[in-house]
Amino acid sequence: MSSVLELLARLKALGIQSAGVADDSRQVQPGDVFLAYPGDLADGRRYIPDAIARGAVAVLWQAGGDFAWNPALTAANFQVDGLRALAGPLAHTVYGAPSEGLSLIAITGTNGKTTVSQFIASAHAGRCAVIGTLGAGFPGVLEETGFTTPEATTLMR
């Protein structure tokens, strides 16, 4: 497995300064690096052409299964072992470590997580955002995310 700094150095050697990273082709913005790896429900490598069409300047992909890079695709690319595990740390670095300036509370359990998070956010003296089943944002002004827990690349953006 490469380190985040090694990945960034490889991108820089190719002349690529990443504006951001995305592991969902629908969220790729021009200048992003697309991270393509097998997921729980879908294989992100199937969406590489879509990510490039949306402006991805490079693709980092994980080998395995019957996947092979299509040489007709013109984006800079390289294979990375353990890419999914590196997605969060890579996003953290590319976006300037945004979570380091936050106080975080995690709520776990079988039932009541949404209720508890809303109670905490409402009772907190300062601005307090929540992420969960109902969406992400501030109490009363939540944006639907479609996910209970967004991927790290989405959270860091």
Show where each model-derived region lies:
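N-terminal leader/targeting and accessory segments in enzymes
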Residues: 1-89, 93
